[in-house]
Amino acid sequence: MSKSKMILAVLASLLLTTLAGTAYADYALNFPEPVAPLTQQMYDLHMLTTKIATIIMVIVIGIVAFVLIKFRKSKGYEADQNFHKSTFGTWSWTLVPIIVLGIDLTIAGSATDALQQVEDYSQKADVTVKVIGSQWKWTYEYMDDDIRIVSNMLPKEEAGDNYLRAVDNPLVLPTGKRIRFLHTASDVLHAWWVPQIVYKKDSIPGYINETWTNIQKEGTYRGQCAEICGTGHAFMPIVVEAVSPEKYEAWKAEKLMVAEAAAAEASSDKTWTKDELYARGEGLYNTNCSGCHQVNGTGMPGVFPGLVGSKIATGDIDAHINIVLNGKAGTAMAAWAAQLNDLELAAVITYERNAWGNNTGDAVQPADLKSARK
Ligand code: HEC
Ligand SMILES: [Cu+2]
């Protein structure tokens, strides 16, 4: 193949790939549709910049092509030695920077307005959600209500086509309300990123970053962690369910009722059987602990200890309760005291003491946790 034929072939295949790409409606060429005023503004800014850049590109490539053909050496063209003395030659050096500056200021003008709004926290928020990133899940705390959502990625079998994009418990938010997000992390850097509804700031352990939005349209909006945070970085997707304020209130009432019932159940004096605790503990273990200790309890050698036959998980019950309740400083083992209630903690510990051949036969009761907390 000659050189020019080869170049043609490459260009043709590139064109074909681009055309084939546009055939998938969901994977359109542009960004997903923004559904909040501020994200709309950012989207428009992106479109403006892209249009300007495209026009400049066409003009510059046009001039270069024109010059290459028109003034080529093979035609015997000789460079004009006095071009810089002509009026156009003199002024072009001044005009081009002026035009560039004008374009820059056009973009900067809209960008400044968007940035000012990003940092505008003068309005009171209707809903405030603390968003906590951790390896590898998101936790949402509604600051004005006693609601806490732990959001884990759905496994492949349950997520289907939305694998890596679906979670068990989405964040539920009302439309048409000013929503304030407080971003932080419990271990390493993460970033909560849902481009359709809100811009992004880092989640930093020990710091709070603030963003806000006002969602205009009901729907399901997906995002992901946008700050590399370890081997599970790809496995902490985000799903936001935006619903009308009426539906949001109904959801909230239901959520509070369930939480109240769970709290009442957890603080009752009932003595639970081992099987009841084990059954509850299995689900809790798989959502909260298996990310590190693995579903089969074997852990990851050298990083996360296995619990199968572990000294703590099969030995002294108080030591087991202690490490789960208080964590271990300086390691990835977090304190679960504030995250799970007594019944949940009793269940997960009972599960660990009886699963995977850890047949201790122990049934740890909520009352044991209650006294250990003191
Ligand atoms: C982010 C990772 C991570 C998660 C999630 C996690 N652990 Fe751990 N866990 C660790 C690490 C690391 C250690 C080892 C700490 C040390 O160095 O002693 C540990 C130690 C333990 C031990 C002591 C094991 C032994 O033999 O030393 C128990 C018991 C335990 N975890 C229970 C749990 C329970 C119950 C949960 C869920 C509620 C949980 N862990 C969630 C990381 C994790
Ligand atoms: Cu992350």
Report the location of each language-model feature:
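Alpha-helical transmembrane segments
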Residues: M57-K73
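Non-transmembrane, membrane-proximal soluble domains of secreted or membrane proteins
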Residues: A25-L48, I69-A279
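N-terminal secretory/membrane targeting signals
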Residues: M1-A25
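Detector for the c-type heme attachment site
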Residues: A226-G230, H293-G299, L325, T350-N354
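Sequence/structural segment immediately N-terminal to covalent heme-attachment motifs in c-type
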Residues: K274-M300, V308-N326
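Flexible coil segments in periplasmic/lumen-exposed cytochrome c-class electron-transfer proteins
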Residues: L256-L277, E282, N286-T287, A335-K374
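Extracytoplasmic/periplasmic beta-strand context in beta-sandwich domains
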Residues: H190, M236-V239, P305, T331, ...
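Hydrophobic single transmembrane helices highlighted by the model
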Residues: M42-G62
